[in-house]
Amino acid sequence: MKKLSLLVSAITAGIFTTAQADISVSGSSTIAYQSADSNNNSAHGGAVSFALSTTTDSGMTVSSGAGITLSASSTGAARTVSGFQNITFATGGTTVVLGNDVGVPDGVGDVGGVVGDIAALNNNGMSSTVGITDDEGTGMSLTTTFGSATVGLYYVADSASTSKALGDIDGATETGTGAKFTTTVGDVGVTLGYATYEDSSADDEETGIALTYAAMGGTLSVGYENSTGTNDGNQAGVSYAMTLDAATVSIGFSSADMTASSSTQTDVAVSYPLGGGVSVFAEMRSVSGDTGTDTSSTSNSTMAIGSSITF
């Protein structure tokens, strides 16, 4: 990483002599053992991320990013190149994002999930949960601060454009909107979210609220969300995270009451840092009620033990 950083610094110093540009490179890797009853697997993946930014003469920061990823939780394990979909402009407490991968603020009340994607691999999952059909695409977002509050407005003109270079702004048939408000009331953090998705056959809406509070040496989070349209129902969740010595322990619980199903999910996660960007983790997820179809390779209870490294 040190040699890579020095190389990138040398190259960018030569190219951007007059501009106030910055290019940073980071990497990560994960290796784990994953189990779903009798289906036992190894999972190995990693990513390299590039963050690019520059500052105009007026002080506005313009940034973008890209990455190369091999997902440890993907059954296909295909290497992907991501990024260069959005450009971010930030100045004076206001941030504007333009691009083909702008997301609306859905999932605000979903606080019960505390495990990573590897522990969730091959889990049957809750059969139905709150959500909208699609939450990103070609569009823009504007976020600004008012004292201790942050307000965000989101518009997606073409939800079918992600991973493409072009978005169909005037002829798109899939659109989305949203708003998000974050503030503190006393010692309680409050986040409100609203998101919509609409196409020729769907008219989805989702609202959510999340509250956070420092309690008993940790952080307690409580959330609630409701959606109508394709996924009609309510979902509530609670999670608690605390540090014991250097270890971080998180427990989460979610309950979904949908039109045709009802299910619960319980998560437990423990991680311990070893220094130098290396940590070990153990995670477990269990679902009950109306779950996904059980097969020889899936289970209502799954777990993962492994190590994650950041470079």
Residue ranges of each PLM-predicted region?
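Outer-membrane beta-barrel proteins
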Residues: 1-311
